């Protein structure tokens, strides 16, 4: 996808705060500090559109970004960081679950995992939950520049086995080299087209 414009729209914690559900939305989910913000920034060619932080758990709101005036990218709060206060964790779960289960214009979810780490139980539960709700999912494996080719192949096998993935449900990505940018966009566009076709067939 050629990105001509990308802009921050709003942040929120509940549906009343979200933009009107007029544009298709692609949500980005994953553990804290897995490279979500960097992935979005590279996809839209805007280095500072989404703030990156070395402090896991920093993103505590659902953030909306409009791309080309025709698509919304949605940055969901990261999960699984032990030092985040329990009270905040309790708010995050319902907030994210409500968004994912009730947002009518959600087209697909990009689930992000770090190639240097085995998928956690939370990653597995998130994927199972999305599948149960029939949400289209692409798993993006980030930080691929941090490992050798042999290690990448080894970790890819672990990730596909642990998450029960087919190879075409996964894409490799590096924010440093921008490897995988075009493939991730291509996969997203396929899921968007499928979602549009499904919506037309159902008369929505």
From Swiss-Prot:
Superkingdom of the source species: Bacteria
Residues covered by region (Disordered): 1-21
Gene3D superfamilies membership: P-loop containing nucleotide triphosphate hydrolases
UniProt KW keywords: Cell cycle, Cell division, GTP-binding, Magnesium, Metal-binding, Nucleotide-binding, Septation
Binding-site positions, Mg(2+): 37, 59
Residues bound to GTP: 30-37, 57-61, 75-78, 142-145, 173-175
Disulfides per UniProt: none
Gene Ontology BP terms: division septum assembly
A GO cellular component entry from the record: cytosol
UniProt GO molecular function: GTP binding; metal ion binding
Annotated EngB-type G domain residues: 22-194
The protein's required cofactors: Mg(2+)
Similarity remark: Belongs to the TRAFAC class TrmE-Era-EngA-EngB-Septin-like GTPase superfamily. EngB GTPase family.
PANTHER family, A to Z: ENGB-TYPE G DOMAIN-CONTAINING PROTEIN, MSS1/TRME-RELATED GTP-BINDING PROTEIN
Role played: Necessary for normal cell division and for the maintenance of normal septation.
UniProt name for this protein: Probable GTP-binding protein EngB
Species of origin: Geobacter metallireducens (strain ATCC 53774 / DSM 7210 / GS-15)
Source taxonomy: Bacteria, Pseudomonadati, Thermodesulfobacteriota, Desulfuromonadia, Geobacterales
